[in-house]
């Protein structure tokens, strides 16, 4: 258990792997804000395998133009921690930032209060020319965006890219804001 407002962070162009763990954290992310897309950093890979995560903030990339290439969640449980005042939990990219792929398999996701961004997807105001993919397989997912967008996909005022969403053999409850 990490103390209040503590998180697992990595700098730009790094990777994070969480395996066989029980985490109580503020977030698991790369925290990089850039002034323009030309200066943007990317989290290469975030992997959560056979773990339980209670979080209050982003799992992926945080900050303007902070993108994530790949998120893999396998055999894990991820829930929103109501203790934290921000509750901005989003699995994916930050504001004005994209993601490559988010692959959730054999997992339980419960994020019922994402703020200003989808619970699974990218942050708001994303303009990018790429194809992204969200795959949910053999999982139970309950997600909600409190405002400015859908629960799964692209946030408010996003465009120019394409997101493919694939749901296989799963129970998904998703409510947009």
Question: Where do the model's predicted regions map?
Answer:
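Surface-exposed loop/turn motifs in large extracellular/passenger domains
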Residues: 1-115, 120-145, 152-176
